[in-house]
Amino acid sequence: MGTLGNERAGATVLPFQASFEREMRVLLDLVRTRGLDRLPVVRQRLAKAWSGLRILQLNNDRLLTAVLQGVHPGPESSIGKLYWANWHRDFGELMMDLLGADALVAADQEPMAEMRHSFLNSRAETIYGGANEIQRNILGERALGLPK
């Protein structure tokens, strides 16, 4: 667990975080272009996604600060991995909901192709780097002291 815990302790999340921020900006631009930003339910869902992204950023900052101070990350790194994988999966679903069929059929048109790729990849993120179930087991055993 030590190696995997250190792997997830912030630095590996940075490229993902930057990618998520870019995806959020692109989605907001597309939503505005289509006039969907006038719909209260869309604004609410986007606000929830943006808030979740901000939580991810703050958690990552906290983990990186701890590592830079020489503190060995504990189960917090599993919380971070579990959170970002689930956030991105949910964000991928939001992208597809808002962009509709265009995101699936605009095969080579940017940014739709990038959004589709991100959606499909977001499913794999809940598996690689430690499946969500494994992360929950780590949290249960190490953070909550539950038996194996």
Where are these regions (language model features)?
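Glycine-rich beta->alpha junctions and the first turn(s) of the following alpha-helix
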Residues: 1-56, 125, 141
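Glycine-rich phosphate/cofactor-binding loops in nucleotide/flavin-utilizing enzymes
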Residues: 1-14, 99-148
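Predominant activation on well-ordered alpha-helical scaffold segments within soluble catalytic domains
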Residues: 21-28, 47, 61, 85, ...
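Residue-level detector of secondary-structure boundary/capping sites
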Residues: 18, 37, 75, 130-134
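Hydrophobic packing residues in well-ordered alpha-helices of helical domains and bundles
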Residues: 20, 46, 77-80, 115
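Tryptophan-centric aromatic hotspots in well-structured domains and transmembrane helices
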Residues: 1, 27-30, 58-61, 84, ...
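C-terminal helix-coil-helix/basic helical segment that borders enzyme active sites and/or dimer interfaces
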Residues: 32, 36-43, 54-107
